[in-house]
């Protein structure tokens, strides 16, 4: 075995030299030099510095501007709340543990950090699923005479929380467990061991099927149908330049959404699956750390992609930041006029 398994931890290094120590009690500088942990702490500080303001601003602007409080925006707010969960409950803890070089908060702290990070990430993931389904239903109209209302929005939010809890809670009650991963400064699901009594294998398979493959399939289907519908609508109005421009904007937005989803989750999921299927094989601590911490950056680019690309929200945000005045009002007004003319296509943009 090329790693060292202990009570509630797994170190990706053999203890043949006697260097390995518990990540709850001792700095792990034998894994990575101190400067590596300092870089990790600086990265987490950057995510906190950007992630908290942009997500908090999203909530504040929506509360400040009544016209943004529509049912279609509920899931976008839910996305911001999920990102704040990750920032407050996960990033702050990881930054402090990185500064110390080990998980200073002990076993209980590992459970708390792992739970909040997993819960926030899963809420965000299932929020994207609900958003893609909402766009598909509203634009492609598979259900005739369907009107997306407040009750549907609340159900979507509740669904995302339920699915997130279905992934984050089991490790707290004995189905799998949270342990320090990578450089031992953040906690996640135990992909590394077949610890007796925790049924890690069944939980990891359940998580990959239900909480990765299913969301990926749903988002791919919904956005694929969305692009086709946009192209069909534009083809029927080829004389309208504004419609063609709206088609390009919407298509670009959808592609960015999908690529961001893949960039966030595929590297982490791929590495986790490799570790799970090659337990005991040799891999370095950075091997899991890089994709795990890259996935955390979703708390920053999620609101940028899903909210700041919304022209109405961007207008309200600029108005709020500029004390009630929008210096770009004329440009926003012309864009709004274009959106009105190309109504059949522009309904694809988040409301």
Curated annotation (Swiss-Prot):
PROSITE patterns: G_PROTEIN_RECEP_F1_1, G_PROTEIN_RECEP_F1_2, OPSIN
Lineage: Eukaryota, Metazoa, Chordata, Craniata, Vertebrata
Record-annotated site: Plays an important role in the conformation switch to the active conformation: 113
Membrane topology: Multi-pass membrane protein
Mod. after translation: Phosphorylated on some or all of the serine and threonine residues present in the C-terminal region. Contains one covalently linked retinal chromophore.
Transmembrane segments: 37-61, 74-96, 111-133, 153-173, 203-224, 253-274, 287-308
Protein name: Rhodopsin
Residue ranges annotated as Cytoplasmic topological domain: 62-73, 134-152, 225-252, 309-351
SUPFAM superfamilies for this protein: Family A G protein-coupled receptor-like (SSF81321)
PANTHER family from the UniProt entry: OPSIN
Protein species of origin: Sardina pilchardus
GO molecular function, one term: 11-cis retinal binding
GO cellular component: membrane; photoreceptor disc membrane; plasma membrane
Classification via CDD domains: 7tmA_MWS_opsin
Glycosylated residues in this chain: 2, 15, 200
Motif 'Ionic lock' involved in activated form stabilization location, chain numbering: 134-136
């Amino acid at each position: 075995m090329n790693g060292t398994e202990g009570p509630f931890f797994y170190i990706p290094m053999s203890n043949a030299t006697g260097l390995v120590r518990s990540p709850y009690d001792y700095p792990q500088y034998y894994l990575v030099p101190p400067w590596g942990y300092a870089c990790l702490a600086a990265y987490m500080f950057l995510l906190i510095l950007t992630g908290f303001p942009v997500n908090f601003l999203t909530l504040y602007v929506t509360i400040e501007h009544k016209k943004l409080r529509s049912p279609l925006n509920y899931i976008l707010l839910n996305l911001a709340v999920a990102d704040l969960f990750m920032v407050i409950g996960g990033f702050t803890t990881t930054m402090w543990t990185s500064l110390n070089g080990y998980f200073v908060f002990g076993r209980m702290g590992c459970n708390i950090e792992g739970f909040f990070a997993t819960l926030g990430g899963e809420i965000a993931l299932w929020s994207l699923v609900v958003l893609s389904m909402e766009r598909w239903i509203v634009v492609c109209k598979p259900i005739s005479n369907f009107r997306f209302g407040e009750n549907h929005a609340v159900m979507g939010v509740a669904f995302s929380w339920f699915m997130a809890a279905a992934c984050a809670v089991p490790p707290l009650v004995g189905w799998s467990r949270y342990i320090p991963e990578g450089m031992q400064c953040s906690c996640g699901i135990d992909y590394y061991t077949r610890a007796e009594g925790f049924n890690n294998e069944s939980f990891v398979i359940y998580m990959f099927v239900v909480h990765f493959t299913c969301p990926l399939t749903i988002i791919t289907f919904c956005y694929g149908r969305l692009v086709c519908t946009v192209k069909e609508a534009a083809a029927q109005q080829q004389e309208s330049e504004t419609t063609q421009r709206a088609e390009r904007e919407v298509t670009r937005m959808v592609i960015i959404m999908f690529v961001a989803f893949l960039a966030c989750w595929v590297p982490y999921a791929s590495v986790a699956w490799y570790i799970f299927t090659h337990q005991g094989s040799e891999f370095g601590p950075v091997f899991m750390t890089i994709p795990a911490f890259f996935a955390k950056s979703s708390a920053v680019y999620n609101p940028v992609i899903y909210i700041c690309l919304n022209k109405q929200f961007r207008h309200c945000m600029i108005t709020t930041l500029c004390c009630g005045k929008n210096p770009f009002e004329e440009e926003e007004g012309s864009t709004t006029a274009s959106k009105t003319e190309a109504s059949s296509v522009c309904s694809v943009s988040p409301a």
